[in-house]
């Protein structure tokens, strides 16, 4: 059952009404929506690898990889393809459904894109879904990635249009929207979400969801990131972690507004109790990253994730016998 047609005309006021519903009503509506489109007992698991770390020319105020800030992070060159494929193979053995590769660039140079395309093709040969995040893309670059077999491209809007300029000045929101359009036009699935806990208001979080839901096509994946603490960046001065109920409400609104999108409970899970993560899954989140490092910041250990899923009676490709391989895989490339 697919339910009502997807909407692309949400208003901020409608989002506010949903968010303010009595909590039991909001959770019921979100879970009912979730069940119309997904198996509520199934969780998608992905693995994330930084294939080129640090030295980014953008000034994103939350990011440890920006060259504008002294975060103590050493910039690296693009990883060797053999090392990337070996990491992907271990991630698959450990239970990952999808392998995501991230490079700290404003936009990829052609010679670098050639190497990334080769990586994508090689990972696809392992039988995994592929995702990359490389910064802004032109239409020809998106077409090259599609030809290489890329499944998903991640390019977040980060926050609401109103709060955006307080966080980033070197790339406009329209730059991001243009890249999303180029990716979609090339036939690649879109992964696009944002970050909460940077000092924005609830209205900004809802504004971000309205922006995403009103794109010409809903993102196929919507990652909701809680800001990971990073020393030396401007967001340190404004950051305020949302309480658990606020996070669950936001997940629920995302599920209702974008009913067929995968909603990923992404960065920041190490700050969440098992009970809060369970509440977010009940609200409609149905994907996580596995492994104990996300790019440059911490993530819950795989043993904890596997144990939680067992206690919840949920299933994923992550199994108790494979968690050691997950942690070994990610730690070797931290």
From Swiss-Prot:
Domain Radical SAM core residues, every copy: 41-260
Protein EC: 2.8.1.6
Cofactor binding annotation: Binds 1 [4Fe-4S] cluster. The cluster is coordinated with 3 cysteines and an exchangeable S-adenosyl-L-methionine.
Pathway assignment: Cofactor biosynthesis; biotin biosynthesis; biotin from 7,8-diaminononanoate: step 2/2
First and last residue of the signal peptide: none
Keywords: 2Fe-2S, 4Fe-4S, Biotin biosynthesis, Iron, Iron-sulfur, Metal-binding, S-adenosyl-L-methionine, Transferase
Binding site for [2Fe-2S] cluster: 100, 131, 191, 264
Record Gene3D superfamilies: Aldolase class I
Reaction equation(s) it catalyzes: (4R,5S)-dethiobiotin + (sulfur carrier)-SH + 2 reduced [2Fe-2S]-[ferredoxin] + 2 S-adenosyl-L-methionine = (sulfur carrier)-H + biotin + 2 5'-deoxyadenosine + 2 L-methionine + 2 oxidized [2Fe-2S]-[ferredoxin]
Family under the similarity heading: Belongs to the radical SAM superfamily. Biotin synthase family.
Subunit composition and interactions: Homodimer.
Protein name: Biotin synthase
Lineage summary: Bacteria, Pseudomonadati, Pseudomonadota, Alphaproteobacteria, Hyphomicrobiales
